From Swiss-Prot:
InterPro entries: Restrct_endonuc-II-like, YaeQ, YaeQ_sf. It comes from the Bacteria. This is Uncharacterized protein YaeQ. Transmembrane segments: none annotated.
């Protein structure tokens, strides 16, 4: 018998001062049995960074043809494709040709640094690609917010994400390895 996903619920309040975006949302995250808590929380952090009422989580690890989250327009085109991890060039190219904007969130300090050294020259050819990096220490702190039922406040200003719940406050600094040109 296959293991089932664990369901997490997040009620979020986002004040993105950089994009003048203010939003309250109730999110459901399905954590696949093979997904770490850190990776799931990075998915949530990516959602917060690009918060929009139309931004949706996809089937994620269960679907090779979909991103972790996407923002689809009224014509079913993809305005934003959010990817996590260390994808190969083929996957990046697919995302960048299908979506108007692509945001890649990398993690796992040692592997991510090596991946970036090997793929930086390939990534720069995609003008609609952002590559973000979150180091292990910060990811562990973000992961500490994980709970089956979460109520989170995120304030984003000057690229910094201030994350808080009823017990914790955290300043999250994503490193921009590449921004769209």
């Amino acid at each position: 018998m296959a293991l089932k996903a664990t369901i997490y619920k997040a009620t979020v309040n986002v004040a993105d001062l950089d994009r003048n975006q203010f939003l309250d949302a109730s999110l459901t995250l399905a954590r696949h049995p093979s997904e770490t808590q850190e990776r799931m929380m990075l998915r949530l952090l990516a959602w917060l960074k690009y918060a929009d009422e139309r931004l949706q989580f996809t089937r994620g690890l269960c679907a090779d043809d979909e991103p972790e989250a996407w923002l689809r327009n009224d014509h079913l085109g993809i305005d934003l494709w959010i990817e996590l991890g260390l994808p190969d060039e083929r996957r990046i190219k697919k995302a960048c040709t299908q979506a108007a904007e692509v945001a890649l969130f990398t993690y796992n300090s040692r592997a991510a640094q090596i991946w970036w050294q090997q793929n930086q020259s390939k990534c720069v050819q995609f003008a609609n690609l952002s590559v973000w990096y979150l180091d292990d220490e910060q990811l562990a702190k973000v992961s500490a917010f994980a709970d089956r039922t979460m109520t989170l406040q995120a304030t984003i200003q000057d690229g910094v994400i201030w994350l808080s719940d009823d017990k914790n406050n955290l300043e999250v600094n994503l490193t921009a390895w590449q921004q769209p040109s």
